[in-house]
Amino acid sequence: MTKFTSKSFYIFLSIIVFIKGCDNHSKNIDPIKGFELVALKLEDAINYEIKSKNLNAISMVLVDDQKIAWAKGFGYEDPKRKIKADANTVYRVGSVSKLFTDMAIMQRVEKGEIDLDEPIQTYLPDFNPLNPYKTPITLRQMMSHRSGLLREPRKGNYFTDDEISLKATVESIIPSKLIHEPESKTKYSNAAIAVVGYTLEVLYQTPYVKYMQKHILEKIGMSNSAFAPNKKIISRLAKANMWSYDNRIFAAPTFELGMIPAGSLYAPVTDLAKFMMILFSKGKGPHGYVIKPETLNEMISPQFGGSRTQGYGIGFRLSEHGGYQKIGHGGAIYGFSTQLYAIPEIKFGVATTSSVDISNSITTKLSNYALDLMLANKNNETLPDYIKTSEIDMQLAQSLEGHYVRGELYADIELRGSSTKLITNYLEVPLRQSNDGIISDGRINQGSFQIKKSGEDLSLIHI
């Protein structure tokens, strides 16, 4: 029998303490110097949203150039087992995946192996959807949502659980007719990005999932991410919920999409932070350049008109925040909602993930608030407060009940118990009292609807 000495015991104990300390440190990341108050304001805002909207888990990361300024999880990764969410909780990040697919194509473009403006048949000879127009479909169009292809592939899409291959998904698109002439209009298309990813699979004779792991995720250093679930991913994947207007809550389905390149990335916010660091280092990763600076600049430049703060670049949605160009993408897939934003000029970024279906209005609001705080902090300004709401006074709520018409918008306001509901032909959302008046405030919509009073008249405003 091996003798276990007191010295061995203390060595063993030291190792355990060290490992446990590392584990605790890796779960959440404390704010760096100067970001302490920013983190406190965000903690308050996130806890408010979780409590008021009955959410499972939210994780957020802030990026300041090549540093994680703060990262933390809130709520429960697994509510039944009471496992708390943290910064390394894994989420399905939906359409944020598109940015990675497009970057993989751009790696090959800068090597001269792919031309974005060649007809797609140059690379996929059998991909011939019905195109009654003279303008051919190209990769550039598909990556900036200007191809005219239908939004969803006929198979392997968000609404089917067939779990077919990427090849079969792309083949299902071929019998379809273009919705618009290529380049004429912006039409968001998951089908198009499925074709983009399939192009990589065909040209380089490697399954898309393996290709992306080697050429994108590993090069960025996203060691806790993947385009298909594995044991490591599943062990940290948040338990996600679906919900309905009649208050039913049920577990989100876990089937894989056939259109993998458009929405199948699994990642924690700490790995999304590494992606944003690539954007701020002009394409340089931990093992060299993932993408060249000039190629990255093309990705964040407007395609087919528009400006640096409007429309799409290659993959990236372009907008404005605080006078700066803001780039990013949202993501929505069964049970999960994500928002990623970056401001390249000042190298600030944020990613927010939620494990409740169609809660994108919340991840978007929180992400924009995070950027507001970071900008105010940078400029030594007073940090703004988060917009919070409360139930509408019962007497006022009763006076709001009725049918509203504004242009093509038809809506009803109903009082249900203590809650005031706005019901349109496409959504139902609570109306609540804020400091600036009555606004929509629910999982599905935040502030897009307002009630304005002019004299004795009430009007419904849709922003």
Residue positions per predicted region:
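Bacterial N-terminal signal peptides that target proteins for export
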Residues: 1-9
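Short coil/turn segments at secondary-structure boundaries
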Residues: 61-62, 154-159, 184-186, 228-231, ...
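Catalytic-loop motifs flanking and including active-site residues across diverse enzymes
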Residues: 10, 97-101, 138, 192-195, ...
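Active-site-proximal loop and beta-strand segments within enzyme catalytic domains
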Residues: 29, 47, 76-190, 197, ...
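Bacterial N-terminal signal peptides
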Residues: 10-20
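Catalytic loop of the DD-peptidase/beta-lactamase superfamily, centered on the K-T-G motif
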Residues: 22-72, 201-206, 210-214, 218, ...
